[in-house]
Amino acid sequence: MDQDLDRAERGERGGGSEELLQEEINEGRLTAREALQTWINNDSPRYVKKLRQGQPELPTSPGGGGGRGHRARKLPGERRPGFWKSLRELVEQNRRKQERRLSGLDRRIQQLEDLVRHMSLGSPDPSTPSASVLSVNPPAQTPLGHLPPRSYFKLKRVDCGAGWDLRTTAAPGLPICELDWIQGTK
């Protein structure tokens, strides 16, 4: 109360109360805690009083700035470390899945290339389903007796209906569509 009268006599309107409180602390009349409480109750801006009483003036988000304004954001690691950890784990899982898929596709392509190579050479390999057909029929009668180079299969797209009658002339057990065969026998 005496402080208010002193300020009123000097014509101050709450502007220099921090200095007055500091003087009283230095002279031993107030403790720091009492001075802070006096400043909060009498001279502080309205939002400090509301924050002090547990009623924040501005809406704050639960992971947000926390006193730096309702739009203020913390640093990414400071915000939610669990979120970033789980995000990194998800990215790593997806990368591993994609690698497994690609390695499976590479194996399948290699199997098909080996199958084509065996069939074009006419070598009877018991693991291929159509090896018996190749060994019985002469290569001139088998539609796959003469094959283009491997690059042909990688560059062309599938056209299974053009010159092929898949029920009669295709080698049994050999899915021609998977080989991207495009030329027919005419």
UniProtKB/Swiss-Prot annotation:
Coiled coil regions in record: 85-120
GO BP: mRNA transport
Effect recorded for G63D: In strain: Isolate R29-Nadin
Function (record text): Escorts unspliced or incompletely spliced viral pre-mRNAs (late transcripts) out of the nucleus of infected cells. These pre-mRNAs carry a recognition sequence called Rev responsive element (RRE) located in the env gene, that is not present in fully spliced viral mRNAs (early transcripts). This function is essential since most viral proteins are translated from unspliced or partially spliced pre-mRNAs which cannot exit the nucleus by the pathway used by fully processed cellular mRNAs.
Any one GO cellular component localisation term in the record: host cell cytoplasm
Gene: rev
Post-translational modification: Phosphorylated.
Assembly behavior: Homomultimer; when bound to the RRE. Multimeric assembly is essential for activity.
Taxonomic classification: Viruses, Riboviria, Pararnavirae, Artverviricota, Revtraviricetes
Domain notes: The RNA-binding motif binds to the RRE present in incompletely spliced viral pre-mRNAs. This region also contains the NLS which mediates nuclear localization. These overlapping functions prevent Rev bound to RRE from undesirable return to the nucleus. When Rev binds the RRE, the NLS becomes masked while the NES remains accessible.
Record's subcellular location: Host nucleus, Host nucleolus; Host cytoplasm
Extra information: The sequence shown is that of isolate R29-127.
Polar residues composition bias: residue spans: 128-139
Chain intervals with Basic and acidic residues compositional bias: 1-16
Motif Nuclear localization signal and RNA-binding (RRE) per UniProt: ranges: 73-97
Main localisation: host cell
UniProt keyword annotation of Secreted present: no
GO molecular function, one term: RNA binding
Motif (Nuclear export signal): 102-115
Chain segments carrying region Disordered: 1-22, 44-79, 121-142
Keywords assigned by UniProt, alphabetized: Coiled coil, Host cytoplasm, Host nucleus, mRNA transport, Phosphoprotein, RNA-binding, Transport
Name recorded for this polypeptide: Protein Rev
